[in-house]
Amino acid sequence: MTTPVVTRFAPSPTGFLHIGGGRTALFNWLYARKHGGRMLLRIEDTDRARSTPEAIDAILDGLKWLGIEWDDDVVYQFSRVARHREIAEQLLAEGKAYRCYATTEELSEMREKARAEGRAKLYDGRWRDRDASEAPQGVKPTIRLKAPLTGETVIEDQVQGRIVWQNENLDDLVLLRGDGTPTYMLAVVVDDHDMGVTHIIRGDDHLINAARQKQIYDTLGWALPTMAHIPLIHGPDGSKLSKRHGALGVDAYRAMGYLPAALRNYLVRLGWSHGDQEIFSTQEMIDAFDLPAIGRSAARFDFAKLENLNGHYIRHCDDAALMTLFENALDFVPGGADLKPKLNDVTRAQLLRAMPGLKERAKTLIELIEGARFIFADRPLPIEAKAAALLTPETRALIDRLRAALESVTSWNAETTEAAMRTFAEQNNLKLGAIAQPLRIALTGRTTSPGIFDVLAALGKETCLARLGDQGSR
């Protein structure tokens, strides 16, 4: 019988869900879903100063916004400290760990000596076999693992391949600090084991941790989960993604107007590939995803590519679904709060009618919202400077005549208003472009907009006639 797949995402609360963490969570979620398993969420909150409720909520909110749903209740590492201590004491009682009374000064000397001699191993093992009766007064001991002194520690990694460490270069790592708090290395192993984790998918900056954690697994006689260490995300210049490259948190991408589905699609392709396919539905991701298809090289974050992909998702999004995304984004994007009070049955209907034209011109929700501002504008419309310069007395007189021609349209839609304007143009020996721009300025306050007949249809007859009247010569 095959053991059900259990993955986990285990972030530390930093105040936001890092974009790299979002990709790690996505990979864990996809792998679990592909194999009919579960993805668990563990918050590694042992740093009490940083682990505020707000910092934890930022991670949970980021995952929910990305559409990554975890299974079961969230596990909080700090709540399991007693269990971590229990395992350390068990290893001590079995002679597989020992108390180390080395002082801070002694440890510093050991590190300096090891570095001077070019040795990877920093701790010299001086308390490994000494009797506790020799312990100095006033020193609170740590508990260290009795790591193997010879041989190799080997990880068969699903991404990195076979990785070998010489045990002579690995320290007897600390399991329990002098104040009784467990170290990260011990806590992670105990938690993963107790949670039934079968696959650990995480960044390759944890590779050295894998060697140390395997030694704990081996000492306890526990089965090592399958490991997959994925390459980190780098900036466009090839260096590690940092603040200077721009947004780091998932929340920042929401504020920049990216769609969750687009960001998921972009993140899954950072380091993983499936032939030449670029666009994936969620189900296609689940069906195609596999660990060996993840490359070993760092993936470069390309903001232009993300923006183009986001534009694709906006253009192909159902209008009603895009309406929901539009409204939800108002709480997060710059200037969104100004529009929110203006959402009502009338403006929602106008927005829905305008959506086919608006979404063709937008790569982000911010651009979509900016393009739609004319719908929510109060009368008389604010006219941008470039457009105002075109509102000559002659243009205003033309707007009066256009309004009169449109007033006679009974069944109001893009086709009927276009027919009326074409007839007007022919009767007055004008090109259609000569009347489209005055209409656009009067109806939107701008020189650019969706197709003018789409604008007429979206706003409706009453609003259009009122706005045209505002900009006419009367």
UniProtKB/Swiss-Prot annotation:
Family: Belongs to the class-I aminoacyl-tRNA synthetase family. Glutamate--tRNA ligase type 1 subfamily.
Chain's gene name: gltX
Role summary: Catalyzes the attachment of glutamate to tRNA(Glu) in a two-step reaction: glutamate is first activated by ATP to form Glu-AMP and then transferred to the acceptor end of tRNA(Glu).
Single annotated GO MF: tRNA binding
Motif 'HIGH' region, chain ranges: 11-21
Catalysed reactions, semicolon-separated: tRNA(Glu) + L-glutamate + ATP = L-glutamyl-tRNA(Glu) + AMP + diphosphate
Keywords in alphabetical order: Aminoacyl-tRNA synthetase, ATP-binding, Cytoplasm, Ligase, Nucleotide-binding, Protein biosynthesis
GO biological process: glutamyl-tRNA aminoacylation
EC number: 6.1.1.17
Residues bound to ATP: K243
Subcellular localization: Cytoplasm
Subunit details: Monomer.
Motif 'KMSKS' region boundaries: 240-244
SUPFAM superfamilies, per the entry: An anticodon-binding domain of class I aminoacyl-tRNA synthetases, Nucleotidylyl transferase
InterPro entries hit by this protein: aa-tRNA-synth_I_cd-bd (IPR045462), aa-tRNA-synth_I_codon-bd_sub2 (IPR020751), aa-tRNA-synth_I_CS (IPR001412), aa_tRNA-synth_I_cd-bd_sf (IPR008925), Glu-tRNA-ligase_bac/mito (IPR004527), Glu/Gln-tRNA-synth (IPR000924), Glu/Gln-tRNA-synth_Ib_cat-dom (IPR020058), GluQ/Sye (IPR049940)
GO cellular component, one term: cytosol
Pfam families on file: Anticodon_2 (PF19269), tRNA-synt_1c (PF00749)
Protein source organism: Nitrobacter winogradskyi (strain ATCC 25391 / DSM 10237 / CIP 104748 / NCIMB 11846 / Nb-255)
Annotated NCBIfam families: gltX_bact
ATP-binding in keyword set: yes
Protein name as annotated: Glutamate--tRNA ligase
